[in-house]
Amino acid sequence: MEEFDSKDISTSKDEDCVPLGGECHEDDINELVKEDEVDGEEETQKTKGTKRKAESILARKRKQGRLSLDQEEEEDASRESGGRIIEKEDAAAEQEKGAESEDARQEEADVLASSVSDAEPKSELPPSTQTKTGEETEETSSSNLVKVEELEKPKKAEEVKLTKSPLAGEEVRFLTQQGRLSGRTSEDEPRRSEGVQHATGEERRADTNTSSKNEAAGQKWKGQSAVDVSGDESKLRCCKEEYCIGTWNVRSMNPGKLDVVKQEMERINIDILGISELKWTGMGELNSDDHYIYYCGQQSLRRNGVALIVNKRVRNAIIGCNLKNDRMISVRFQGKPFNLTVIQVYAPTPYAEEGEVYRFYEDLQHLLEITPKIDVLFIIGDWNAKVGSQEIPGITGRFGLGMQNEAGRRLIEFCHHNRLVITNTLFQQPSRRLYTWTSPDGRYRDQIDYIICRQRWRSSVQSAKTRPGADCGSDHKLLIAKFRLKLKIIPKTTRPFRVTNEEDATNEEAKSVLKQNEKEKPEANVPSTVSSVPGGSGMTKEVGETSQEAKSVFKQDEKDKPQANVPSSVPSLPAGSGPEKCDLEKKKDCNN
């Protein structure tokens, strides 16, 4: 046998310390010992973790009543031995996963090792001692990977429970946290109201789900409105009210027809009504019961004429009016947040001269230019034009009637130039609520009356249609539209009369005289009922005075000239003869 030599033992130990044939130092040995201690601590923590898992699984199974006595003993044994069974299962699963993704982990380990080496201070050991075997490299990379994953992994949101507790007769919501790590329960946690601390993502989701359930059940918290609206949006909603605007061609307006029109306004709740073919002389304004009328016509002829009638609801919101001519008139109302301007027009017929049509659109364009761009604008009336059923984006809709004519083409060009939209072609309605004119024999129907507004205020119009039930003895139908806006009610106040110069004084005096005359004789320009003239087949006479004065004048003329109505073919007879007296009496009876 060979002799035992102690030098061989020391040499073998040194060789074990130096894997690459280098010298072995005490620092290297201490480093290896520290690594062994760290590995031991990790194994101890793993053992404790497996024990906790085993205890939790056993408690869960006991609670569910699924374990027998033998199974409980086996679980106790495995728990006492440090959860070796679970460790073996976990190790096998990890080994399988590691075999499948070894290459991927190696790449990730290299990247993470480089990042860790940059962040941590470098070791003072020589390169020879820092070199490790393949197994140690895998363990180090896996441990680094776990550490980085733990650092990068976001903290799990704390579980939240929504509870309610009565306080002073009201239901107050409190959010409590279940702190598993700190060991505190919801009872130990101090109450906090909403808004004291920032809620987590799960808190917000829980609150959203609770609010949606309350909305579905029709419940709401005390002191909260049914609709949660921001400040600006709530102001915008509360400043809008629904108003009704309309236009009607009445084919001349007498006192009896005016009463019918006012009754229809009250029945349908029309706030602003435009009138075409008024056929009144002069211009001005007058009160009629609860309605106020602005009108404009020719000076001497009872032809054309337009008017705007407003009810008492919007009377005090009027800022002023512009009596342009016998074909157009405008009235401006004060509103929130924008003012309202309404223009009533009566366009020339298709058989009118080209110069008259040109002057009409020129005057209307001038009236639009002096109207503020920010105002809510409506142009209503009888346009005597057919725009057709073809849709023109931004100008007409799909619900027009008939074929487009030359007057309709001119109207579309005017709307395109001024960015206007024809509202009563935008809404789908039955045909009887689309046409605005009917021929006397009832065979033809057309859409020639329109309510036009600016494109930017198109959404404020809620509906537009005709009312066939309204009748005032005209071949046109009443056309109305409902829109949403807030009109400001201005209280009536007496303002002092102030004059800056002589020219202003003259203008103010003229205006005061005109208003005084209109107040004294408001019905002077309204035509009375029509009387027939004998001997003029089909001829009519429009009387400006009262009917009693007209009758007295007519009788006086008959007494002065009794022979004027006797036919020339009757031969003259002696005075006092029977046939002459009989013929005159018959003629008087016929005239009466």
Curated annotation (Swiss-Prot):
The alphabetical list of record keywords is:
Cytoplasm, Nucleus
Tissue specificity here reads: Expressed in liver and lung with higher expression in brain.
Q: What is this protein called?
A: Craniofacial development protein 2
Gene3D superfamilies, A to Z: Endonuclease/exonuclease/phosphatase
Question: Annotated region Disordered: where?
Answer: 1-225, 499-592
GO CC list: cytoplasm; nucleus
Compartments it resides in: Cytoplasm; Nucleus
